[in-house]
Amino acid sequence: MQKEVNIIGAGLAGCEAAYLLANNGVKVNLFEVKSLMKNDIQKTNDLGELVCSNTLRSKSKKNAAGILKNEMKLLNSLVIKAALENEIPGDDALSVDRFGFSKYITDKIKNHKNINLIEQEVSEVDYTKVTIIASGPLTTDKLGKNIELMTGNEKLFFLDASAPIITKDSIDFNKVYWASRHNDGKDGQYICIPLNEEQFNAFVEELKNAETIKLKSFEKEIYFKGCQPIEQIAKTSKKVLLNGPLSPNNLIDENGNTPFAVVQLRQDDAIDSLYNFVGFQTNIKWPEQKRILQTLPGLENLNIVRFGVMHKNYYINSPKLLNRSLQVKRNKNIFFAGQITGVEGYIESASSGILTAINVLAYLNNIKIEQPSRKSMLGALNFYITNPKHDKLKPMKCNLGILDQQNKNAKSEFYSFDESEREIRRFIKGINNFAKIGENNE
């Protein structure tokens, strides 16, 4: 009899898990509610929708994100395939056309013989069936309450935000220039809006005094560091702005000058018609967003196609609830994957789906496996979110600091990259008696 698994949520983690399990002959019932009820930041009915930035971060072998993406590629990641098929210029980052990216994933999932996409809300988890909960940081209220009953723990949360997107043809190119921090060629350059000190100070004052959407009384201002609203940063420190989203470093204009501050715009789609603000996540009210952004040089007549929004991201207290296999300690049939586990970011969420699916496959075959070690980014993230020494989990992006780098002073500048690749290849070899990882498995 064909083995069967339920997966709740068809975001990046859910789709990765479904893809791997289906490629290994498991029948997957993939539940997704977005075609019936979208949350505040979902815009399309496609699966694997990128709701915040359109970049999967750095491609560098020296960077944690580059290391993790290489590990995912070795594990036949659907998300990495979709990204490479829909890549657009983005300096040293893997930037994608978000619509083509999601369509690629949707087509792969819908056309897979072993995946049954069920468009309905799951309000109660069937504990008698092997299930992966990958419902994401915006889990519906009904399912969220059911998860709370199952875990016996309060859910944690942080506030996340996304940046506005504007049309390229509404930019006055007489007042902006093209530049890149990491790439001297034309490809991958960003649109740069130069600000002198007076303009910078005026813009900061606008941000500090902007009218924001009021938080509910029970929503304390708990932000994830990588997604702090721009207005919150402005209230904190001008220096942080100048060293962060408005940094002018290496953004030299056509006259060879470096402005006091720079606002960057990054290409958002394949046909080069849309651009998003780099590092400009915001909770400012929509009319205020337009008014304030129009004070920037070259954006006097800007056309905003998507305003920045803030939303609450839920996640469970994984160290108390899950074992190393991302399996609920008190109910072995239930597994979690994605941002709801406490990883933060697109690739972190997707990679979590891959690892959870491998653990589910092992469970279905009654096989105990050794998890990837902390020499790999995948193993390090898994160790971090399931480490019982954490009293209260804080969301985590991949970073070099969580790796086990015993010989990090080794001569090779690509030591961490090489070590992680060796570890993932070792991991794949250790599971090849029951899990097939590769192209010929679709």
From Swiss-Prot:
GO terms for biological process: tRNA methylation; tRNA wobble uridine modification. Its EC number is 2.1.1.74. FAD binds at G9, A10, G11, L12, A13, G14. It catalyses: uridine(54) in tRNA + (6R)-5,10-methylene-5,6,7,8-tetrahydrofolate + NADH + H(+) = 5-methyluridine(54) in tRNA + (6S)-5,6,7,8-tetrahydrofolate + NAD(+); uridine(54) in tRNA + (6R)-5,10-methylene-5,6,7,8-tetrahydrofolate + NADPH + H(+) = 5-methyluridine(54) in tRNA + (6S)-5,6,7,8-tetrahydrofolate + NADP(+). Pfam families: GIDA. Its cofactor is FAD. Keywords: Cytoplasm, FAD, Flavoprotein, Methyltransferase, NAD, NADP, Transferase, tRNA processing. Gene3D superfamilies: FAD/NAD(P)-binding domain. It is found in: Cytoplasm. It comes from the Bacteria. GO terms for cellular component: cytosol. The keyword DNA-binding does not apply. GO terms for molecular function: flavin adenine dinucleotide binding; tRNA (uracil(54)-C5)-methyltransferase activity, 5,10-methylenetetrahydrofolate-dependent. PROSITE patterns: GIDA_2. HAMAP family: TrmFO. Belongs to the MnmG family. TrmFO subfamily. Catalyzes the folate-dependent formation of 5-methyl-uridine at position 54 (M-5-U54) in all tRNAs. This is Methylenetetrahydrofolate--tRNA-(uracil-5-)-methyltransferase TrmFO 1. It comes from Mesoplasma florum (strain ATCC 33453 / NBRC 100688 / NCTC 11704 / L1) (Acholeplasma florum). The gene is trmFO1.
